[in-house]
Amino acid sequence: MNRLKEKYVKEITPALVSKFEYKSVMQVPKIEKIVINMGVGDAVQNAKAIDTAVEELTFIAGQKPVVTRAKKSIAGFRLREGMPIGAKVTLRGERMYDFLDKLISVSLPRVRDFRGISKKSFDGRGNYTLGIKEQLIFPEIDYDKVTKVRGMDIVIVTTANTDEEARELLTQVGMPFQK
């Protein structure tokens, strides 16, 4: 069993039950999935950009991403419907816990001038979104092979009903929130 999953079962669940006074263990919020999305705006002019983004996301997530395509044509962006404009990957189960563990313990500390992540990025329904400005913070990415620095969005979807419950869950897991 993964280190984070074990911690969740043995330590976090009892702590959350006592703090929020749940009647059942099944009411305790848990992390459902993690979605990593990388928008590739320059894929409109450069078709190879989408391939490198897919390759980098595969290294980061350990799973092959899906290429996202434009829903509408936008003349101002020279964009046609159906053109590839990004890549996303959804992690669940064991891979999700592995990725979260790596994100918290290895990748986030590598961010320049890191003082913790914002407490304001909850959506009101217990989900947390984290924006990362460069893919170089992940140890799987080889610095010399990077052609362009790209950012990504990481969405942590939980079963929590309120932001307060989700914040407590993520704090217990070890997310480094700002003081």
UniProtKB/Swiss-Prot annotation:
Pfam families: Ribosomal_L5, Ribosomal_L5_C
UniProtKB keywords: Ribonucleoprotein, Ribosomal protein, RNA-binding, rRNA-binding, tRNA-binding
GO molecular function: rRNA binding; structural constituent of ribosome; tRNA binding
TM segment ranges: none
Tree of life domain: Bacteria
GO terms (BP aspect): translation
InterPro entries: Ribosomal_uL5, Ribosomal_uL5_bac-type, Ribosomal_uL5_C, Ribosomal_uL5_CS, Ribosomal_uL5_dom_sf, Ribosomal_uL5_N
Job of this protein: This is one of the proteins that bind and probably mediate the attachment of the 5S RNA into the large ribosomal subunit, where it forms part of the central protuberance. In the 70S ribosome it contacts protein S13 of the 30S subunit (bridge B1b), connecting the 2 subunits; this bridge is implicated in subunit movement. Contacts the P site tRNA; the 5S rRNA and some of its associated proteins might help stabilize positioning of ribosome-bound tRNAs.
The protein's assembly and partners: Part of the 50S ribosomal subunit; part of the 5S rRNA/L5/L18/L25 subcomplex. Contacts the 5S rRNA and the P site tRNA. Forms a bridge to the 30S subunit in the 70S ribosome.
UniProt similarity note: Belongs to the universal ribosomal protein uL5 family.
The protein, known as: Large ribosomal subunit protein uL5
UniProt source species: Bacillus pumilus (strain SAFR-032)
